[in-house]
């Protein structure tokens, strides 16, 4: 392996590493979205099941207020692009379940792409290691032969 090929492989390894980081971040965001949707489903279902409708409303900065849910069957959902729709509680739960299913499918695709990328990175790393080992063997070959010759001379005495 010549110097140029080694540099090219190192470049690809770096680029693939950056792509892998992007995929890993996407997976983390998707998992956070999935967990938020699961928590929302749990909260919506608990409102229907009973209680007095009092919830903790986080207002930021670690502060919360006790709030009374006036209409637990009317749920406002952000469906994307800052579009908010009102749905009945049960329909909102179904919408969130569908969103979770979509997120899980996307997570699977991104995870598969990440695995392929990591496999390619491993192959490149192996090629680089082989190239370095060959270069070291070629550079150290004359020295090793020289040392080996001394060893044979000493054995013969």
Annotated model-derived regions:
Residues 1-79, 83-157:
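Intrinsically disordered, low-complexity regulatory regions in eukaryotic proteins
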